[in-house]
Each structure stands twice: as structure tokens, then as C-alpha cells.
Amino acid sequence: LVTTNPANNAPLSIIATGVFTAGGVDHPGDKVDTVVFPNGTFKIAHSNGTGTQRFNAKTCLGTIVLNGTYRLSGGTGAYAGISGHGIYRLNILIVAARNAAGKCSQKLPPTAFQQIIRAQGPVSL
């Protein structure tokens, strides 16, 4: 999953490979995401994850790394009967904007944001 939009509910680009290959959109939720591919949909239930957050006040660079688990279910169309589970790793890089005084600001929108989630585990259809 990849996004460059810092909004919490922004759709994410998703590419799946393995048992099937497809590209589509992930609609994130607090505990369950909905994945929409051209031939159907399914749900990804996920843990919040645990990890680290760091911010460098000199460079305005923030990093977040989280590891967690997920489970697939609720498939429709080509994904009816999908099941699977596994682990994920979330990486976020943020470059905070600087305010008029030249200090990093958490109130202004970031100048750059990148989120990448890599997941792996067995899947059955």
C-alpha cells in the first residue's frame, strides 16, 4: 500500500502479488480496511501495530515504523471465500513545513509525506 496524502482516511494505492495479481484502492479504517480491485473486494482486519516514532527538529524529518498483523476475509466477486493472514510493516516519512521563524511546524501541512505498507502471508481463494 502506498500513499502520499497525509489525511487519515485518504485512499491508498494497493498492488497484490502471489495467489493473484491485481491493482486497486484500499479504503482505510481504524481496524478494518476495504480493498477494491476491478474484479471484486475484500476486507483487511489489522492490528494497530507497534514500533517507533522519531522527529529531527533540525531537519524537520519525521519517521514512523510500525509492525503488526492482519487477516483477510469478506471477499466478493473474484475474491469470494478469500482467507489469509500475516504480518505487515508500515513506514512513514514526513518532512514538516517550516513556519515564518524557520522552525518545524506541526500545525502547517507537511511539505512531503510518504507511507508504504508491505504485507506478507498465506492467502487462499
Where are these regions (language model features)?
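Beta-strand-enriched cores of mature, soluble protein domains
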Residues: L1-L125
